């Protein structure tokens, strides 16, 4: 699903003609999304948003246009699949009753086992209730899964009263002080019969009063997931969704985007047949993967570094104007931000006013990078008080910092000297600005 987008990103980043590469990438993106059964209108809206942002926004200083474009694509694709919504997967209270619903063939019973294993690994005492009385093999399947993961299963194989079974199963596990109880309900209706499914869900809900209802959707239905997820979301405000079989279909993108469009929360995705192949769904992590995780993470890290650097520059301006004081914590933030932005030689070439440093020999730049690493290690061994007020760092503190950072006292002193030099330079700039303003005031009189 959407696998070709990784190659499209690499091709785009290595292209020489920027404008042509942008148009080619957008076409490739549209084709990939439509092939993944994402609604055409959603695809059209997505590409328009990308184009609008390209026109209205400018890349941060030191960020190449290509990288900025990919970061916009990453951002808008993440929104398509749910944005910054991080589902709460841990129970809000103990005991916690979960009711699973879904149409036949959605993988609901297997998902019940996967959920049980997920919570068991987190240290919870979990019980399963087999309340699917319409599919003959459902009870046996859940019992088999329970044995595999060592989780008890309550069921009444000769009884067809699903609500009664669910109620008695929940009561049994509650009396035995179980933390999480997962109820597997009947999935006898096919897609297109959502009304009957939701009616059954309401009846079961009123009897067992679960803390959460989770709808299980098969990814292979693609954008058809919209109707089912929409009605479920309206009927059950406490509900969330698990999208299964993401590994076995090209339509996973369509299913995820359709569910996200309803506003319903996707909690997990099933990524394989094994019981441990259940993943907490994070839209940004998902998009990172389909675009090529390494490429995207390095670009986003660089942009974050630049944003942090620009914030630090504002602090420097405040220091020069006398509104703030420079601390070692500020130096630490500045060096950390610079490291996120890439190799020192590239950073110096891209930052405004630093082009002159592009002629610095490679060996000296490497030494500079090594020094930055060492300074960061030293500052990591300092207390918050020392970072915020370096004047308190005496000989005994220097020895302690050197020992903690695996450096020498001389190297700690070198950092403190560098800090003092920077402080003096900023004070000098401040004095010069003050003198310039004084002359301006006198000349204007």
UniProtKB/Swiss-Prot annotation:
- What Gene Ontology terms describe where this protein resides (cellular component)? signal recognition particle
Lineage: superkingdom: Archaea
List UniProt keywords, sorted A-Z: Cytoplasm, GTP-binding, Hydrolase, Nucleotide-binding, Ribonucleoprotein, RNA-binding, Signal recognition particle
Does the keyword Ribonucleoprotein belong to this entry?
yes
Example of a GO biological process term: SRP-dependent cotranslational protein targeting to membrane
Query: Where, in this chain's numbering, is GTP bound?
Result: 102-109, 184-188, 244-247
Reactions that this protein is recorded to catalyse: GTP + H2O = GDP + phosphate + H(+)
Q: Where in the cell is it found?
A: Cytoplasm
Molecular function GO labels:
7S RNA binding; ATP hydrolysis activity; GTP binding; GTPase activity
EC no. given is 3.6.5.4
Summarizing the function annotation, the protein's role is: Involved in targeting and insertion of nascent membrane proteins into the cytoplasmic membrane. Binds to the hydrophobic signal sequence of the ribosome-nascent chain (RNC) as it emerges from the ribosomes. The SRP-RNC complex is then targeted to the cytoplasmic membrane where it interacts with the SRP receptor FtsY.
Please provide the record's free-text comment about the domains of this protein: Composed of three domains: the N-terminal N domain, which is responsible for interactions with the ribosome, the central G domain, which binds GTP, and the C-terminal M domain, which binds the RNA and the signal sequence of the RNC.
Family membership: Belongs to the GTP-binding SRP family. SRP54 subfamily.
Subunit: Part of the signal recognition particle protein translocation system, which is composed of SRP and FtsY. Archaeal SRP consists of a 7S RNA molecule of 300 nucleotides and two protein subunits: SRP54 and SRP19.
UniProt-recorded name of the protein: Signal recognition particle 54 kDa protein
């Amino acid at each position: 699903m959407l696998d070709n987008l990784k190659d499209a990103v690499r091709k785009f980043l290595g292209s020489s003609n920027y404008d042509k590469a942008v148009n080619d990438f957008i076409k490739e993106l549209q084709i990939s999304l439509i092939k993944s059964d994402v609604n055409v209108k959603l695809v059209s809206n997505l590409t328009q948003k990308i184009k609008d942002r390209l026109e209205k926004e400018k890349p941060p200083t030191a960020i190449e246009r290509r990288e900025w474009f990919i970061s916009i694509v990453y951002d808008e694709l993440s929104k398509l699949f749910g944005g910054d919504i991080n589902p709460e997967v841990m129970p809000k209270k103990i005991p916690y009753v979960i009711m699973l619903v879904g149409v036949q063939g959605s993988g609901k019973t297997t998902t019940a086992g996967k959920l049980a294993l997920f919570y068991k690994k987190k240290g919870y005492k979990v019980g399963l209730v087999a309340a699917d009385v319409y599919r003959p093999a459902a009870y046996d399947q859940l019992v088999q899964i329970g044995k595999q993961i060592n989780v008890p299963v309550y069921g009444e194989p000769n009884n067809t009263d699903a609500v009664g079974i669910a109620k008695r199963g929940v009561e049994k596990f509650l009396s035995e002080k179980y933390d999480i109880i997962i109820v597997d309900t009947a999935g006898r209706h096919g897609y297109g019969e959502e009304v009957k499914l939701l009616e059954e869900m309401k009846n079961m809900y009123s009897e067992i009063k679960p803390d959460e209802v989770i709808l299980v959707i098969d990814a292979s239905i693609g954008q058809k997931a919209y109707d089912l997820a929409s009605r479920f979301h309206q009927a059950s405000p406490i509900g969330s969704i698990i999208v299964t079989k993401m590994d076995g279909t090209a339509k996973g993108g369509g299913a995820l985007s359709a569910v996200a469009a309803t506003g319903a929360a996707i909690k997990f995705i099933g990524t394989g047949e094994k019981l441990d192949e259940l993943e907490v769904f994070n839209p940004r992590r998902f998009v990172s993967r389909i675009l090529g995780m390494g490429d995207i993470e390095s670009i986003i890290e660089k942009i974050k570094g630049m944003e942090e650097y620009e914030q630090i520059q504002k602090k420097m301006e405040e220091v020069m104007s006398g509104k703030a004081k420079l601390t070692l914590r500020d130096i630490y933030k500045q060096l950390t931000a610079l490291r996120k932005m890439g190799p020192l030689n590239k950073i110096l070439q891209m930052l405004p006013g630093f082009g002159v440093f592009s002629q610095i020999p490679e060996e000296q730049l490497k030494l500079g990078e090594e020094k930055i690493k060492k300074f960061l290690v030293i500052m990591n061994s300092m207390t918050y008080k020392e970072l915020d007020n370096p004047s308190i760092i005496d000989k005994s503190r220097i020895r302690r910092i050197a020992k903690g950072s695996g450096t020498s006292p001389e190297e700690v002193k070198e950092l403190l000297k560098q800090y003092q030099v920077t402080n003096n330079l900023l004070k000098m700039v401040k004095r010069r600005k003050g003198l310039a303003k004084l002359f301006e005031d006198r000349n204007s009189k």
